[in-house]
Amino acid sequence: MAMRTRAEKRMRKFLIEQLKTRQQNGARIAQGKKSEHELIKNNLGPQVFVFRNLFSGQVLYSQVPAYHENQINQQFLSPNWQNRKPSRRQDLWKIMCVVNFNNYEYAIAAYKGLVDLRKTRDVVQKKEANEMRKKNDDGNIWYSGQFRPTYTQEAVADLTHVIDEFELEGTKIFWANEWHRGDDKHWRADLVEHDKLPVYDPRHQTVLLDIMREKAIEAFRENNTSEETIENATEPETA
């Protein structure tokens, strides 16, 4: 087995420390809901990040490329043995998709809509929602081990509903696995475009999400510049 040089060991240690710092800073920024002003101030794009729990199949929404314990508490309001409050362990939460919106107003409306739909299903209409879920022979939500795929399916359905209901044109969704998006017939082609997330090392998820953040900001600025150019060109000249 090849021995690592001291320089390689120092570089590896430095990279690990950088990843830990990135995770800690991301979690701090993720705390609490973000207004348009706060998103711009923190150099964040008009996005929603959808994380999937590998152990349970549960889904967590975030306005930033990270998540915080407070978000778990706010989005899992009525935990029970079939829908336990999940741990915030970094190795369990993996990105399912990154959703880029045309502007910050759209992104904030979508995030609120997704969280509100979750609350309606888990608290307000808990009985009705549970009746619609696939059951096993014992009458419980179908599962394999502790994994319940219904939560991922509901999250995708909620995402399609929010985009349709608010008519969020110019939406672009980057999927970690395109299988999760389902059939094209469930998505309006005039509102949303689909793509794949770049291939990445699962251990370096924070790096990927930071790249996606930067790209979203660039796309938003380019789009705004183009719109301003068109508006200026179409304005009538004053005598």
From Swiss-Prot:
Annotated family: Belongs to the mitochondrion-specific ribosomal protein mL67 family.
Main location: nucleus
Annotated protein name in UniProt: Large ribosomal subunit protein mL67
Compartments in which it is found: Nucleus; Mitochondrion
Cellular component, GO annotation: mitochondrion; nucleus; ribonucleoprotein complex; ribosome
Function, as annotated: Component of the mitochondrial ribosome (mitoribosome), a dedicated translation machinery responsible for the synthesis of mitochondrial genome-encoded proteins, including at least some of the essential transmembrane subunits of the mitochondrial respiratory chain. The mitoribosomes are attached to the mitochondrial inner membrane and translation products are cotranslationally integrated into the membrane. mL67/MHR1 also has extraribosomal functions, being involved in regulation of mitochondrial DNA recombination, maintenance and repair, and generation of homoplasmic cells.
One GO biological process term: mitochondrial genome maintenance
Short name of one Pfam family: Mhr1
